[in-house]
Each structure stands twice: as structure tokens, then as C-alpha cells.
């Protein structure tokens, strides 16, 4: 087995992915610090020839077409989820989602007059594109004439290529 992930490892996962537990044939890494971290034999137990620094293959076909677009792309938070709905194959949200720090912060940010005025003055558009798990709550956020809400299913490659600035939190967007 080869460990191929969808993001960049942020936390110490050596107990989970270490050779004594998984014994992978190889581990694909996407960033130099991540590669160097996985190469620590004392933590993971793998030889360096079994750790491969490849980058993200999904970025190999990206094109660069920057426009005056600022994309705000926060990740989801487990604490905002109540439970998993097996029938609908989705998370249900906590009842007080609109009272959460996450909601208040991002609703305030995308409706901040200073940001809106600066975008208008400089000819920028703003896109709000939260993690697909959060997108079910897009209707909860206040709307304005400058911020466009991108729905689940919008191609990430287009957002990455067309944005001149991407703002995220600790996610790997």
C-alpha cells in the first residue's frame, strides 16, 4: 500500500502512519517540510527511499489566469456539526450555527464595509467559497453586492487559477 493523501499533513501522525502500524510501501508527500517530517526515521520508521516528494498532481494542469478576484475559502469545523445523517449522507449542523464564532467571523468579514469599499475602489470582486460541508449553510450568511457565493461543485482549479488572492484559515485550500 502507498499512502496518498488529499492534503498536506499538519499534525504529528507518526503513531497512526508509522511503520509499526501501517507498514506502507511508500508515502507520497506534497511539500518539502512535509517530506522532511516523514523522513524522520525515529518518528515514522521508514527509509527515505520510501518517502516520495511529488507535489500535488492535481496542480500539474493548473493554469494561471489571475483576475481581480479575492477568494475567501474557510474550512469546516467539526464543532459546527451535530451528527451524521446516514440517509442523506451529510452532516447536520448544530442548532446554534448562526451564533458560532465561525459564522460571526466570516459573516462579519464578507460584509465588512472597509473590505467592500476597498474592493469597489480597486475594481476587485470577492468570492466566498467555504468547504463543501459548510456550503449547505450559505443561505445563512448576509449578502451584499460585492461578494459572490460559490456553491458546492464549483471547480477548485478555476477558483485557484482566476484568483489573485486566496484567503483561508488553517485548511489546505
Regions found by a protein language model. Give the residues of each.
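Active-site and donor-binding regions of nucleotide-sugar-utilizing enzymes
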Residues: 1-62
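A donor-sugar binding/catalytic signature common to diverse glycosyltransferases
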Residues: 3, 154-173
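Short, solvent-exposed loop/turn segments at secondary-structure junctions
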Residues: 7-10, 32-35, 57-59, 75-79, ...
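Conserved acidic residues
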Residues: 25, 68, 163-164
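Nucleotide-activated donor-binding/catalytic signature segment of Leloir-type glycosyltransferases, i.e.
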Residues: 137-152
